[in-house]
């Protein structure tokens, strides 16, 4: 491949790209939008400042540096750490949350999306907030705001953002709609058919909370607007559109009418805030569909971008696009870290962004100028009809990649001769093997690093005193197979291929534990339960409230039998109780509906005459139609939950009337929602990890690493394997590294502390200067999260969430563990 130095070869760009980078100040792909940047620190103010003892924000502080100035736990005594307390949520499922600690209060999530406040010194439960939405989700933390007089805690519950009183956990009714706002509102189309959720907590700046969201990765998907809401009222303060409309910068990088239908280009990874400059740095992901872009020809700004936005107004200051016309799901996967580095004897405030490709980009915070050279390199072109691949992609020259960049015969596993031979045989059937190989029809395309990075959502840690960044990374390969979508097939299989096969595979077998098998699903669940998961989502799965009527029934039949029900067959009778036909909550006066009498007789004793409930023990039913759909509420009514008894005798027409009274909406059963969800010309057959016959990676170790890079020079200080498989270690194959999710923290005590490894149930502390392992502690389950550290009553603690959800070989739970010195 030939490279083009960004600062001298900009004139050789294709004309379409020149048009959008004409203001690039001599640097291709980094665009400056004229805007006054100078802001006095006193004018901006600091909405959240980390004291030496607290951890008041996701990532430690708004800069996302994962740094603590605490030194009580240090290199000399870290080996003496012991368990100080544990908090067992009593639940099983994924916890990826990093607690926020303010004073002696610790705020975090349980696997079922309850928010809890604990005594940070003892782990004692102080309060619980239960929204009534118990479907697991990848919620990685809460946001804390204070102006010194009042304070608020913000918690995402899938499509809702709640404002809670940090002292009591009760919703603040003056915020939004009685304590929450619905993030689906204000996007494109009918918000009740949209799906969005807060994977990462919002960023706080002054008196606004800035949010992105996780969007579906298939059509239809809402646009990935970045929005700021007033922390007191919930009112929208500003919006930045990542899919530009006519007249907006970047519009020319899409087809003419793409803004009407294109989706995602969203921020799910989190953000960093420079409070003195008043800038929020926003990494975005790819546009849908992830693996085929024939309907979005062009570079697709502002997908896969690092955005610098004025945090006061949302105005674009500069951007850098890391992947043009993404066909590989190469989202920027983590919030950037703010750091100050030395350049030519001067200190330069910088922003560091890690990538799934195993790269790190470093920019001047003020103007977006790259601090290390970046080349636009020619890349392979697609042979798929209708596709229009970008001719080049940007590649940083420094630092060198923190993962290997390709797989070949020399880099396959040598765990056993048989494993190597099997891996070699598979490799010869694949296309690709490295970066930016477009999908080839009907042939597995090998992607390395895989869809899980490189770097991932845990983010990086930066020591502000040295300018050294610490990054954990995955080094396993995945394959995807692009296939033509048979539009002559029936509704069930077309809907499955369009919405489900991306994760669960064409054969419904998935890639456990991340993507569970759907074979035999109806042996474990009822039809309404499956429909509820489809409509609300679960874990990393987005919700699909747009799937109703014929499409939903046909999909359920296909999931139940593996046979397609076809376009004309209504299979609701085969999958359990039918979904009652319910009018839109806005179309009728709830008090005029006959269901009011049934509610008074059966529900009001617990939930109150005005549906207000007594949270958290008895949830309010006000607005339940914005949290749950008809399938979910029907399932709760018929089967009960917790202290609520079942009411199986409530059936239509009384059931429909009750649901109307509660404001619960769905389409009429049998109606077609009319979207184009299954009409993409191509889809993929799922994510498949390149493994040997025994389930270990088919590439050579290390399979996971921890890396230290001096950002002043771009040079590595050290690189070590991170994690191991206990069963391999028992046979003498140690320090292989494993897949790891969650990030590190770094302290003034000279330590890098990280759990993250999928299989060995360990948390470790390393010498930040040398990478030497100084301590490891055992956990009840794997700690797939980023730890936090803080001091209460003169004692420093390290706390980590554990759950085991990524290890199908072992049990799961939901336990927080805190360590301290004796």
Regions found by a protein language model. Give the residues of each.
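N-terminal secretory signal peptides that target proteins for export/translocation
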Residues: 1-16
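Bacterial N-terminal signal peptides
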Residues: 19-34
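N-terminal pre-domain segments of enzymes
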Residues: 37-71, 385, 390-424, 672-683
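Mature N-terminal segment immediately following signal peptide/propeptide cleavage
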Residues: 43-91, 98-101, 706-707
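Repeat-blade elements of multi-bladed beta-propeller folds
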Residues: 55-59, 94-112, 136-161, 194-220, ...
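Extracytoplasmic/lumenal domain signature
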Residues: 77-90, 115-135, 148, 161-193, ...
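Extracytoplasmic electron-transfer domains, predominantly the class I c-type cytochrome c fold
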Residues: 197, 279, 494-567, 590, ...
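Electrostatic cytochrome c docking/interface patches
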Residues: 477-495, 511, 563-598, 614
């Amino acid at each position: 491949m030939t490279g083009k130095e960004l600062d001298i070869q900009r004139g050789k760009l294709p004309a379409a790209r020149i048009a959008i980078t004409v203001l690039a100040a001599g640097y291709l792909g980094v665009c400056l939008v004229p805007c006054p940047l100078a802001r006095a620190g006193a004018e901006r103010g600091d909405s959240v400042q980390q004291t030496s003892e607290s951890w008041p924000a996701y990532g430690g502080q708004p800069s996302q540096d994962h740094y603590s100035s605490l030194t009580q736990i240090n290199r000399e005594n870290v080996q003496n750490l012991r368990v100080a307390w544990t908090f067992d949520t009593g639940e099983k499922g994924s916890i990826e949350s990093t607690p926020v600690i303010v004073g002696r209060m610790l705020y975090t999530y349980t696997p079922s999306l309850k928010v809890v406040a604990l005594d940070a010194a003892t782990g004692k439960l102080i309060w619980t907030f239960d929204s009534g939405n118990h479907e697991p989700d990848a919620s990685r933390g809460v946001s804390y705001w204070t102006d010194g007089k009042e304070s608020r805690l913000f918690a995402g519950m899938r499509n809702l953002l709640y404002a809670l009183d940090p002292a009591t956990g009760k919703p603040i009714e003056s915020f939004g709609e009685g304590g929450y706002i619905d993030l689906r509102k204000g996007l494109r189309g009918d918000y009740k058919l949209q799906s969005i959720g807060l994977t990462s907590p919002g960023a706080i700046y002054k008196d606004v909370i800035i949010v992105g969201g996780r969007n579906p990765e298939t059509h239809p998907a809402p646009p990935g607007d970045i929005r700021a809401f007033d922390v007191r009222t919930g009112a929208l303060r500003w919006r930045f559109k990542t899919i530009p409309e006519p007249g907006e910068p970047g519009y020319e990088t899409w087809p003419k009418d793409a803004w009407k239908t294109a989706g995602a280009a969203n921020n799910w990874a989190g953000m960093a805030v420079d409070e003195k400059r008043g800038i929020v740095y926003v990494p975005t992901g790819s546009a849908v569909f992830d693996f085929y872009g024939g309907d979005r020809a062009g570079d697709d700004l502002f997908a896969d971008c690092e955005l610098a936005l004025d945090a006061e107004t949302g105005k674009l200051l500069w951007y850098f696009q890391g992947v043009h016309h993404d066909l590989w799901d190469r989202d920027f996967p983590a919030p950037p870290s703010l750091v100050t580095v030395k350049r030519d004897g001067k200190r330069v405030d910088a922003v560091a962004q890690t990538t799934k490709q195993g790269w790190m980009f470093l920019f001047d915070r003020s103007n977006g100028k790259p601090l290390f050279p970046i080349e636009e390199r020619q890349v392979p072109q697609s042979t798929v009809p209708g596709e229009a691949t970008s001719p080049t992609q940007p590649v940083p020259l420094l630092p060198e990649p923190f993962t290997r960049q390709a797989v070949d015969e020399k880099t396959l596993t040598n765990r056993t001769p048989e494993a190597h031979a099997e891996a070699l045989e598979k490799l010869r059937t694949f296309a690709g093997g490295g970066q930016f190989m477009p999908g080839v029809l009907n042939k597995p395309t090998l992607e390395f690093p895989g869809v899980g990075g490189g770097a991932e959502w845990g983010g990086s840690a930066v020591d502000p005193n040295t300018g050294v960044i610490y990054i954990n990374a995955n080094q396993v390969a995945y394959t995807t197979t692009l296939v033509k979508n048979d539009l002559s097939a029936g509704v069930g299989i077309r809907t499955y291929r369009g919405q489900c096969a991306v994760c669960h595979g064409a054969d419904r077998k998935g890639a456990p534990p991340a993507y569970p098998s759907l074979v035999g699903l109806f042996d474990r669940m009822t039809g309404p339960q499956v429909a509820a998961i489809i409509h609300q989502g679960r874990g990393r799965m987005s919700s699909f409230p747009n799937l109703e009527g014929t499409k939903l029934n046909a999909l359920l039949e296909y999931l139940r039998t593996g046979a397609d029900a076809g376009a004309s067959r209504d299979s609701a009778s085969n999958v359990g109780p039918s979904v009652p036909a319910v009018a839109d909550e806005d179309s009728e006066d709830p008090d005029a509906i006959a269901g009011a009498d049934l509610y008074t007789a059966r529900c009001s004793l617990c939930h109150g005459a005005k549906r207000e409930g007594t949270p958290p023990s008895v949830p309010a039913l006000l607005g339940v139609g914005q949290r749950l759909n008809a399938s979910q509420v029907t399932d709760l009514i018929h089967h009960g939950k917790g202290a609520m008894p079942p009411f199986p005798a409530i059936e239509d027409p009384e059931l429909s009337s009750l649901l109307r009274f509660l404001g619960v909406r769905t389409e009429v059963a049998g109606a077609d929602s009319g979207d184009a969800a299954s009409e993409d010309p191509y889809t993929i057959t799922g994510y498949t990890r390149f493994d040997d016959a025994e389930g270990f990676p088919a590439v050579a170790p290390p399979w996971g690493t921890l890396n230290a890079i001096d950002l002043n020079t771009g040079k590595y200080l050290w690189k070590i394997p991170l994690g191991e498989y206990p069963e391999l270690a028992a046979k003498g194959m140690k320090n292989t590294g494993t897949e790891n999710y969650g990030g590190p923290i770094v302290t003034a005590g000279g330590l890098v502390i990280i759990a993250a490894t999928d299989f060995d149930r360990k948390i470790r502390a390393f010498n930040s200067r040398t990478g030497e392992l100084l301590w490891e502690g055992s956990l009840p389950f794997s700690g797939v999260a980023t730890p936090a550290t803080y001091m209460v009553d003169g004692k420093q603690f390290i706390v980590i969430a554990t759950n085991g959800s990524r290890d199908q070989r072992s049990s799961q739970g939901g336990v927080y563990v805190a360590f301290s010195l004796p």
